[in-house]
Structures are given as structure tokens and as C-alpha cells.
Amino acid sequence: MLKELRQKRPLVHNITNYVVAQFVANGLLALGASPLMSDAIAEMQDLAKISDALAINIGTLNERTILCAKEAIKHYKALNKPIVLDPVGCSASALRHGTSLELLESEGISVLRGNAAELGSLVGISCGSKGLDSHYATTPIEIVKLVAQKYSVIAVMTGKTDYVSDGKKVFSITGGSEYLALITGAGCLHAAACASFLSLRKDPLDSMAQLCALYKQAAFNAQKKVSENNGSNGSFLFYFLDALSLPIKLENSLIKEEL
């Protein structure tokens, strides 16, 4: 799929948070997609016509970006183009949680991607504010299936192990690097990358599993370079962009169907 992505170079429209916009754009370019970064409400209809997919990230949410996201969903949905929602921090505030629910109620979201706390909060399950470090009675497999069923989406839960579900099947994806949790924007770029893969119009469940595996493998490859050069967080960020731009052979990442 990565080869096809690089041949097609899909245009991915991002309504993302201001902290990570440059990193997300560079990451998409490294993968082989073309980034478009805009949250101007007046141009949502025009951009929906020329873009191949939309990624919405609520990391720096405000009243204007809420209206922008709603307007964008309306136009992308009308054109039957894929939309990824990354409900960043939706378990942390009423505004984020309420906005996420409103966007999901549009029934235009194709993929809902987040950590355990974020996805859990959208189905009434408390997993703690940090998500990845939380302890909860409901398993990740149960949460991701429930999310997919409730909102009729492909649910993607990221963490040390990723889980992807269409409400029936669940795939787990292992591998990756601990450094992903130590840089800003890894999850935001992941959501944009999900949108780029969806634009290829392949089976969405398989596409998301493949994307998660490739992303984790690139992170693993970057970590090896960090170790070889006695680096740390900063060098990982640059090696990760390099790894995304190179051919990615799945060696460390494993996709497994859960029963």
C-alpha cells in the first residue's frame, strides 16, 4: 500500500492543532502524501472538492475550529470522501468531549482514532486521563469493538499495542518504539497518515491495520538509528521522518487477528 500511496500522492486536508502542524505536514510528505493545512471556514467547500481525505484533530480546540470542523464534515460527507477524527484529550474536558460527540453525530466519520482514555470516554468507560498508563477493567479489545459498533466507524486505538476494529473483527499490532510517547505530534501525524491510507479506497479495516504496522516499524527503525548514534528524543524525531520516507519492511511489527 505504501508504494501505491507514493504513486498517487493523495492530497490530505488537515484541520489540526497549531502545536504540531509543521510536523504533521512533514510527516505526510515523508510518507508520500501531500499535506494541506487549513481551518478557514469559508474555503471548506472548495477544499473538499480537491482533497482526497480529511483529518480532524481537536488538540487546540476553540469555537472557530469547532465550526470549521462541522462545515468540513458536511462537504466531505456529501462527496463521500474519507474523514478521520482524532478526539485529542476528549476525556479531559466537557468542551472536548461534547465536541467529539457532536462531530460523531454527523455520521460522516470514517475512522475514529485515539488512545484508550479518549476512546473509552466516548462509550462511557473511564480509563484515566493519561490513557496509555491507565488501568481499566474493560479490555482494549472490548473498548475498540464497542466504539466501532456504536459510531459505525473503524476504531483505531493506539498505544504500546495498537488495536483496530470494525465492530466485528479486531486486529492487534505490536512493535514500535517508546520514543513515540516522548515526542509531540506522533499521534496527530498518525491520524493524518490514517487519512492518507483511506484515500486509496482499499478495505478500510485492513488499511488501518497496515498503516499501524508500518508506523510502528518506522518508529522501530528510527529507534535503532538513535541507539547507533547515542541520541535521544530530538534525534528520534528526525530519524522517524527519515524512516517514514524510506521503504518500510515489516520486521518488528506484527499484525494479529484477535479472537
From Swiss-Prot:
Residues binding ATP: R113, T158
Reaction(s) catalysed by this chain's protein: 5-(2-hydroxyethyl)-4-methylthiazole + ATP = 4-methyl-5-(2-phosphooxyethyl)-thiazole + ADP + H(+)
Record family assignment: Belongs to the Thz kinase family.
Signal peptide interval: none
Gene Ontology annotations of biological process type: thiamine biosynthetic process; thiamine diphosphate biosynthetic process
Record function comment: Catalyzes the phosphorylation of the hydroxyl group of 4-methyl-5-beta-hydroxyethylthiazole (THZ).
Pathway noted in the entry: Cofactor biosynthesis; thiamine diphosphate biosynthesis; 4-methyl-5-(2-phosphoethyl)-thiazole from 5-(2-hydroxyethyl)-4-methylthiazole: step 1/1
Keyword flag Nucleotide-binding: yes
EC number, as in UniProt: 2.7.1.50
Names of the cofactor(s): Mg(2+)
Annotated keywords: ATP-binding, Kinase, Magnesium, Metal-binding, Nucleotide-binding, Thiamine biosynthesis, Transferase
Record GO terms (molecular function): ATP binding; hydroxyethylthiazole kinase activity; magnesium ion binding
Protein name: Hydroxyethylthiazole kinase
Domain of life: Bacteria
Gene3D superfamilies according to UniProt: 3.40.1190.20
InterPro entries (alphabetical): Hyethyz_kinase (IPR000417), Ribokinase-like (IPR029056)
Pfam families assigned to the protein according to its UniProt record, in alphabetical order: HK
Binding-site list for substrate: M37, G185
Listed NCBIfam families: PRK09355.1 (NF006830), thiM (TIGR00694)
